[in-house]
Amino acid sequence: MPRYKLTIEYDGAPFFGWQVQDTLPSVQGALEAAVKAMTGADLRVHGAGRTDAGVHARGQVAHVDIEKQFPPGRFRDGLNAHLRPHPIAVLEAEIVPDTFEARFSAVKRHYRYRIVNTRANLALDIGHAWRVPRRLDSDAMHAAARRLLGKHDFTTFRDTECQAKSPEKTLDQLDVLRDGREITIITSARSFLHSQVRSMVGSLVWVGEGRWTADDLSAALAARNRAACGIVAPPDGLYLVKVDY
């Protein structure tokens, strides 16, 4: 039974997250329906990251085992045909060893968060970025972000319903870059807690607005208390960009 690795991009706006839902649209559910249309079988598609409702992906990775072996290009094209009109694209399909696990074989996940720092309404970026009208000091945000690098207990920055066994994570990258009115926050780690990226982004926005200092961010981290977190950024601006193996 061949195992296929799929590289996928999607617009998360119409979906209630990656994970399959009984009655609500999900990315996993749409992919599994496409696989069934090709194979006639109900098969589980396993993702590298269970993105929340409204979160997008440019490089989500998944794997699926199927009985029949298709040429990878044909399998990719067939899935894309059956996925229409969902805003999901299978960019690549390849046959991998059965030891490969999309989630557990991953060594690093890369996310990007888009902020449009403008008083004007969003037009083309609605649902794909967070509009923040108050002027943000991106240099202060970047400097404060240094405080979160490395291994920490990120209890403050995880959802109260997070099911991870440990709140400790090692943050390898957290950069804040400005290009005109757009601010991009780039982060990477082996894995993240539920809502960790959005919680860090929202707290950094408080730094950018002048509500918090870098010391306030450090104090929030040290508190190990969800109540100490700043605002949680909306899902619109978050993208799973790449998964390393």
UniProtKB/Swiss-Prot annotation:
Pfam families: PseudoU_synth_1. SUPFAM superfamilies: Pseudouridine synthase. It catalyses: uridine(38/39/40) in tRNA = pseudouridine(38/39/40) in tRNA. It is an enzyme of class 5 (isomerase). The active site is at D52 (nucleophile). Substrate binds at Y111. GO terms for biological process: tRNA pseudouridine synthesis. Homodimer. Formation of pseudouridine at positions 38, 39 and 40 in the anticodon stem and loop of transfer RNAs. Belongs to the tRNA pseudouridine synthase TruA family. This is tRNA pseudouridine synthase A.
